[in-house]
Amino acid sequence: MLSRTLRWLILAMVSALPAAAQTFELGSMEPRRTLSVGVLYAHDSWDEYWEGTLKRSNGNIGTLTTQSVTMMTGYAVTDRLGLIAALPYVWTRASQGVLHEMSGFQDLAFGAKFRLLSSRPGRLGTFGASIAAVAALPTTDYTPDFYPLSIGTAGRRAAGHLALDFRSNTAWFANASASYMWCSNVRLNRSSYYTDGQMYLTNEVVMPNVVNYTLNTGVELGRLRIPVSLVQQRTLGGGDIRRQDAPFVSNRMDFVKLGGGLMYELPKNLSVSLGAARILTGRNVGQSTTFTSGLAYALHL
């Protein structure tokens, strides 16, 4: 059986790279005492980005490529409560210019989800609701002050999620979720910085919080599952990239992303996944295309 616990993280990566576990498929739970492990590879690249609302290319960057390998695990404590953890190793590279590549372990994400309710099977199908809480902590002292090559924000994050789901009596499923993510302040290795039209004589940067809205739908045909997702991210604050300047860690980063994938169950509790996603529109982000592939194994203890 394809691990439902690891579906959360697979869909999270397809929807919102490179941050682990920002969005989840919350509509199903793994049977109690099921341990899941998996690995996910992601390749994300862009050669155009939005400088505020101005879309442009940059000869000092060329094509910016971010790759990651994420180790994931999940455990179903009960039929209604599941735990997850994920740790990505990330490396970035610009094809032009003098900016050097960066690499390292990013943030350890861990959390839990709880199934609030599940309706009895009806004429159309079943309805349900779930909640989740996730936290992420940096595992290394990587710098957040080298965007767009920094591998992360180097800050602590915590998020709450709420999802409603529907599974038809045929092969169709859908769910909608919303999340709110709190972001801690981050510190730079310098005594001052300039952003959003102001000079700050401190090394501490106030980070804006983030909200995400996700729609997932698709079909499940025997061992094959085909999901499609639409994700909107809105940053609650932050300034735009200054004209002809580098991005900054606290910039407003908004986008709408369309993604899809294939998940197939193999014998012996193995499953494989392939995914792709494209940013349709954004602000202070690259118009990236993302490809993912994953392998998962589920064991009932």
Model-derived segments and spans:
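Short loop/turn motifs that connect adjacent beta-strands in outer-membrane beta-barrel proteins
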Residues: 25-33, 80, 118-128, 170-172, ...
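Transmembrane beta-strand segments of Gram-negative outer membrane beta-barrel proteins
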Residues: 28-47, 129-135
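Residues that define the transmembrane beta-barrel architecture of outer-membrane proteins
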Residues: 33, 65-69, 103-110, 127, ...
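Residues on the lipid-exposed face of transmembrane beta-strands in outer-membrane beta-barrel proteins
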Residues: 39-41, 71-75, 85, 110-116, ...
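Transmembrane beta-strands of outer-membrane beta-barrel pores
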Residues: 41-47, 87-93, 116, 135-141, ...
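Surface-exposed strand-loop-strand hairpins of Gram-negative outer-membrane beta-barrel proteins
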Residues: 43-68, 144-150
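Outer membrane beta-barrel transmembrane domains
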Residues: 48-59, 199-301
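Outer-membrane pore/translocation modules
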Residues: 98-205, 250
